[in-house]
């Protein structure tokens, strides 16, 4: 399909294909959401300065587009994105066919000057390029706010009107305007929007089969068409980029004090230099975007991150009141020789340092079910404190501990099997014992736990299952499962 226009237009090399125009239009439509996203990210860091700009983004973008597009139309003959695709805009001659092929071949320079956009044509094109897209965005936004919810209610069999939208007994001018505006969005704008897109489709099809010179109905209204840049256009653009030739008056002006390096930063020189540099910024930004897409999609970045983390020996986080890793390493070796390959049995092994009592909830004053602190030895460093198996899909909690994603997800939701067994009295949580430094309290709690496990007595109302809390520390996890982060080990 992309060669069809070329076969039909073998005698008109300056007429672009429809696919070139669609690619240019697609690039032009991608600029506003991209800039809005970058501005939103920057607003999160500096909301004091950028929040108002983000709230008025459509107006600010329309104003900047007006300045940039006017400069490119006057100097390069096309819009910012059209210049990137080597396209331009020119007037259509009032001849029979609107074409002068002989003059185009014999005198391309004078033909270019005669078809160049005049000042009135520049403002007409600015109305089409900036004004109509701005009005379209505002109407689409207003339709999504005022008309789309009611339309969905009607389709689902809901109420057909909203009494709050009726005019009050003595309405003001603003209330009358908003009432008429909402009525237009609900009753007229859907048909108007359909006619807008159907007219563009009709002109695109007519342009594809060489039945019209205009690819858009708005270009037909202002008498402007889009063409490829000719050799005369490239020569004129090269002269503009090189700068105007120096005259004796300009040379004397440059020789004045302060007109050298500081003259480059004057508003008269900085304005065109800044706008001209956008010609190089657009392809550079596209290349950077494609590079970032490849970087995140490929496995190369993961390999580099994995190599960087292999050399780091990050110790486990220490919580106040728990046994430090240095004290755990000082255990007698005879106590750990029962089953060194099983991390579950290692947690059950007795030691001279007893575990502290479980944390107490500040709201319900009930003990919170937690799991023991993982051992600090290198063999069990990559094991999950909850399931005591090798880490699968490692996920970090806000407290700094790393668990299996399935374990921490079900734990925060209160659905883990260890929590269910503990609260039902089926067991003490596989490897958990509520010991403490106090012998009397520890024996009493241990006896109560063991008796509850033997008799199958439920612990509901006497314990908290740890739902929404860190399994090791018992601290509340802000955001629940939304606060979890994947890590690379």
From Swiss-Prot:
Binding site for Zn(2+): 384, 387, 404, 407
Gene3D superfamilies cross-referenced by the UniProt entry: Zinc/RING finger domain, C3HC4 (zinc finger)
Subcellular location: Peroxisome membrane
GO biological process: protein import into peroxisome matrix; protein import into peroxisome matrix, receptor recycling; protein monoubiquitination
Zinc finger (RING-type) stretch: 384-444
Annotated pathway: Protein modification; protein ubiquitination
Pfam family, one: Pex2_Pex12
This protein's domain notes: The three subunits of the retrotranslocation channel (PEX2, PEX10 and PEX12) coassemble in the membrane into a channel with an open 10 Angstrom pore. The RING-type zinc-fingers that catalyze PEX5 receptor ubiquitination are positioned above the pore on the cytosolic side of the complex.
Known function: Component of a retrotranslocation channel required for peroxisome organization by mediating export of the PEX5 receptor from peroxisomes to the cytosol, thereby promoting PEX5 recycling. The retrotranslocation channel is composed of PEX2, PEX10 and PEX12; each subunit contributing transmembrane segments that coassemble into an open channel that specifically allows the passage of PEX5 through the peroxisomal membrane. PEX12 also regulates PEX5 recycling by activating the E3 ubiquitin-protein ligase activity of PEX10.
Name listed for the protein in its UniProt record: Peroxisome assembly protein 12
Species, as recorded: Emericella nidulans (strain FGSC A4 / ATCC 38163 / CBS 112.46 / NRRL 194 / M139)
Lineage: Eukaryota, Fungi, Dikarya, Ascomycota, Pezizomycotina
